[in-house]
Amino acid sequence: MEKRVLVIEDYSSIGNCSLTAGIPILSAFGTYPVGLPTALLSTQTAGIKGFTFVDLCDNMIPAYKHWKKLGIKFDCVYIENDKGRNRS
């Protein structure tokens, strides 16, 4: 049985990073990744100015509580480290 991994990262609509990269990589390792986005960005932040940013943190706990009501459990959690990220 596949291990279910909760992936907590932002979602960059354009770029090869964040949830768009993490989910397929974890899936390739034979896990069942479930994304919990922290934010929605128009593009990745590295080297790109003027991107748009929508904070989704207020939705994280309600989403998790919904999964809990459904009996969904996770074997492990992967949390993005965005230390030093430029949000300009």
Where are these regions (language model features)?
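Ribokinase/PfkB-type carbohydrate-kinase core domain
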Residues: E2-S88
